[in-house]
């Protein structure tokens, strides 16, 4: 049996009827822990009037096991073990934390990695020299430059300095262009994470209304491209009707759109941008936001998303937490891209 949530099941009801993704039929999604469950990464309080909380941490563990099997199968055939090179500039604590997590995750799935540290005053030319060397190194499968970069370095120039076939962040102009043309490409990891959450959870997209709050070229735009494009193209999309909001969208206008949305994806970097009155009953809410705010209770800094989680979870059908939602999935999709790059499946 499927899990009823506020008057509809995981596969039928307010989020629509099967087929689920594109024009294909979604696998059955059962209650957490039920035999035959498509994915067991949901956490539910057992109170049916609250949203199903999608654990990106648990889903990422499942994907990393898939990647680990893929890596070992690839190596067992006599191929070179995938190798990820990470370039980190400066001493931003958050960037160092993100990189440590990526290196740890790579090791867990059997991917070799190396960290190339550069001071914050490194020149753009020196960074391009580093990417050139890595591009030509046959042992390197994937390259990423941890963002943000110092103000004197143009991020787009550096991202385009990475060979498209090794661009595991998916930021090169060729990968972005192929994504926009519905062709196979190395997809930006955060956008891929959101898409994977939607697919594996069984959330319907075909013909549905989606709001993406945030239009960055690395996150918001790729998410919108994945969701609105044709499900029968070379790189299938979600066949959804997508509205993109941004910093100049008036709050009341945003509210009009979100109240009609079956799926709300928030990547604006504004704490509590999405409140419960902006969400319709049973909508799926995916929070990509990363914000550090002062916690008046503990007196410490805490990580929150862009959604008023405690209030919205009482109204939504699905919701991702921060932390523990899109973040772990982004790392998993980065590792998946590294394996794809090593196997030269795209290029």
UniProtKB/Swiss-Prot annotation:
Pathway: One-carbon metabolism; tetrahydrofolate interconversion
UniProt xrefs under SUPFAM superfamilies: Aminoacid dehydrogenase-like, N-terminal domain, NAD(P)-binding Rossmann-fold domains
Record has Membrane as a keyword: yes
Main localization (coarse): mitochondrion
GO biological process: 10-formyltetrahydrofolate metabolic process; amino acid biosynthetic process; folic acid metabolic process; purine nucleotide biosynthetic process; tetrahydrofolate interconversion
Lineage top rank: taxon: Eukaryota
Molecular function GO labels: methenyltetrahydrofolate cyclohydrolase activity; methylenetetrahydrofolate dehydrogenase (NAD+) activity; methylenetetrahydrofolate dehydrogenase (NADP+) activity
Keyword set, alphabetical order: Amino-acid biosynthesis, Histidine biosynthesis, Hydrolase, Magnesium, Membrane, Methionine biosynthesis, Mitochondrion, Mitochondrion inner membrane, Multifunctional enzyme, NAD, One-carbon metabolism, Oxidoreductase, Purine biosynthesis
Reaction equations catalysed: (6R)-5,10-methylene-5,6,7,8-tetrahydrofolate + NAD(+) = (6R)-5,10-methenyltetrahydrofolate + NADH; (6R)-5,10-methenyltetrahydrofolate + H2O = (6R)-10-formyltetrahydrofolate + H(+); (6R)-5,10-methylene-5,6,7,8-tetrahydrofolate + NADP(+) = (6R)-5,10-methenyltetrahydrofolate + NADPH
Binding site for substrate: 98-102, 145-147, 323-327
Pfam families registered for this protein in UniProt: THF_DHG_CYH (PF00763), THF_DHG_CYH_C (PF02882)
Organs and tissues of expression: Isoform 1, isoform 4 and isoform 5 are expressed in brain and placenta.
Protein location: Mitochondrion inner membrane
Membrane topology according to the record: Peripheral membrane protein
Positions annotated to bind NAD(+): 214-216, 247
EC number: 1.5.1.15, 1.5.1.5, 3.5.4.9
GO cellular component: mitochondrial inner membrane; mitochondrial matrix; mitochondrion
Family named by the database record: Belongs to the tetrahydrofolate dehydrogenase/cyclohydrolase family.
PANTHER family (alphabetical): BIFUNCTIONAL METHYLENETETRAHYDROFOLATE DEHYDROGENASE_CYCLOHYDROLASE 2, MITOCHONDRIAL, C-1-TETRAHYDROFOLATE SYNTHASE, CYTOPLASMIC-RELATED
Functional note: Bifunctional mitochondrial folate-interconverting enzyme that has both NAD/NADP-dependent methylenetetrahydrofolate dehydrogenase and methenyltetrahydrofolate cyclohydrolase activities.
Official protein name in the record: Bifunctional methylenetetrahydrofolate dehydrogenase/cyclohydrolase 2, mitochondrial
Species in which this protein is naturally found: Homo sapiens (Human)
């Amino acid at each position: 049996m499927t899990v009823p949530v506020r008057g509809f099941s995981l596969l039928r009801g307010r989020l629509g009827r099967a087929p689920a993704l594109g024009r294909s039929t979604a696998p059955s999604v059962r209650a957490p822990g039920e035999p035959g469950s498509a994915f067991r990464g949901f956490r539910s309080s057992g109170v049916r009037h609250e949203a199903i909380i999608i654990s990106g941490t648990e889903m990422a563990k499942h994907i990393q096991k898939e990647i680990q099997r893929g890596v070992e199968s690839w190596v067992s055939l006599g191929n070179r073990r995938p190798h990820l090179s990470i370039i980190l500039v400066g001493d931003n604590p958050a960037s160092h934390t993100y990189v440590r997590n990526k290196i740890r995750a790579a090791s867990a799935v059997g991917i070799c990695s190396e960290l190339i540290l550069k001071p914050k005053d490194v020149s753009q030319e020196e960074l391009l020299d580093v990417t050139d060397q890595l591009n030509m190194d046959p042992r390197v499968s994937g390259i990423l430059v941890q963002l943000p970069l110092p103000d004197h370095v143009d991020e787009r120039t550096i991202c385009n300095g990475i060979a498209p076939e090794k661009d595991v962040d998916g930021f090169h102009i060729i990968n972005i262009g192929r994504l926009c043309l519905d062709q196979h490409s190395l997809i930006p990891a955060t956008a891929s994470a959101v898409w994977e959450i939607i697919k594996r959870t069984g959330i319907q997209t075909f013909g549905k209304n989606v709001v993406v709050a945030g239009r960055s070229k690395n996150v918001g735009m790729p998410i919108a491209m994945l969701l609105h494009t044709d499900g029968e193209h070379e790189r299938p999309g979600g066949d959804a009707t997508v509205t993109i909001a941004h910093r100049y969208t008036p709050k009341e206008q945003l509210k009009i759109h979100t109240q009609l949305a079956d799926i709300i994806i928030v990547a604006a970097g504004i704490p509590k941008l999405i409140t419960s009155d902006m969400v319709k009953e049973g909508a799926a809410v995916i929070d990509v936001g990363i914000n550090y705010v002062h916690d008046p209770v503990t007196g410490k800094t805490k990580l929150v998303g862009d959604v008023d989680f405690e209030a919205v979870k009482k109204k939504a059908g699905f919701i991702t937490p921060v932390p523990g939602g899109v973040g772990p999935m982004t790392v998993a999709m980065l590792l998946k891209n590294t394996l794809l790059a090593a196997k030269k499946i795209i290029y």
